[in-house]
Swiss-Prot record:
Subcellular location: Plastid
Lineage top rank: taxon: Eukaryota
EC number of the protein: 2.7.7.6
Protein name (record): DNA-directed RNA polymerase subunit alpha
GO cellular component, one term: plastid
Keyword Transcription: yes
Provenance organism: Euglena longa
Subunit composition and interactions: In plastids the minimal PEP RNA polymerase catalytic core is composed of four subunits: alpha, beta, beta', and beta''. When a (nuclear-encoded) sigma factor is associated with the core the holoenzyme is formed, which can initiate transcription.
UniProt record, GO biological process: DNA-templated transcription
The entry's keywords: DNA-directed RNA polymerase, Nucleotidyltransferase, Plastid, Transcription, Transferase
Family label: Belongs to the RNA polymerase alpha chain family.
GO molecular function, one term: protein dimerization activity
Function: DNA-dependent RNA polymerase catalyzes the transcription of DNA into RNA using the four ribonucleoside triphosphates as substrates.
Swiss-Prot/TrEMBL catalytic activity: RNA(n) + a ribonucleoside 5'-triphosphate = RNA(n+1) + diphosphate
Length: 220
């Protein structure tokens, strides 16, 4: 099989996910079920994102000053430390941070890691847009509206140091769901309906096209 005809039936973007329904008509395909499984396998194994959070460190200062410049002493705490002045516990903040999705400029593939910082000064609610990224880094946060935590009191300040790595040992698959069904039409014959669900860091249709590169279509 050398040619595939693709129809986009549905393309929806939501807050935390992207959904695509594709109609796929492979030409001269002897086994449609095998072809569908090969696409599913390629999407699960080959579509990876390697920019992930690999370490999170918390530091607190109990200074009563509201002026950030006067805060000099921060003490490290672990994620199981209970802070009354913060609504969420630190372990839940870790979970929220790991929901963040990152994009990296592909032109700069030499940067293997970077550190980003979140300072909780003079605000009550903090989201991904409050994270400070070094100006020298090409890293971008995709879901800037992702909520991280709320402060109940300004008596304490929390500093979060986050390590982001571009490493093959740390990766996740942005494809969340893959389903396919085989259908038959009297006019065009057999075809495959592919249901793709991904996080907001990737377009499902582009992921599908990328997955085809790993298939030997001539032998399918």
């Amino acid at each position: 099989m050398k040619y595939i005809k693709i129809y986009i039936l549905r393309n929806k973007k939501f807050k935390n996910q992207n959904i695509n329904f594709l109609k796929i008509k492979p030409f001269n395909c002897p086994n449609y079920n095998f072809f569908g499984n090969e696409i599913r396998r390629s999407l699960l194994l080959n579509i990876k994102k390697t920019m992930t959070i690999t370490n999170i460190k918390f530091f607190i200062s109990k200074s009563k000053s509201k002026h950030p410049k006067k805060l000099k002493i921060f003490h490290p705490v672990n994620e199981f430390f209970d802070i009354e002045e913060i609504k969420e516990n630190l372990s839940n903040i870790c979970i929220n941070l790991k929901k963040l999705r990152f994009k990296f400029n592909p032109k700069n593939n030499k940067e293997k890691k970077t550190f980003i910082i979140l300072n909780s000064f003079n605000k009550k609610s903090f989201s991904a847009k409050d994270i400070i990224i070094p100006s020298t880094s090409n890293l971008k946060i995709v879901n800037l509206k992702e909520h991280l935590f709320n402060k109940i009191s300004q008596k304490i300040n929390l500093k979060v140091l986050i390590k982001i790595e571009n490493n093959e040992n740390y990766f996740y698959n942005p494809i969340k769901r893959i389903n396919f069904i085989l259908e038959k039409n009297n006019n065009i014959g057999k075809y495959i309906i592919l249901d793709l669900n991904s996080d907001i860091n990737i377009n499902p249709f582009k992921a599908f096209i990328e997955s085809l590169k790993y298939l030997n279509l001539n032998n399918t």
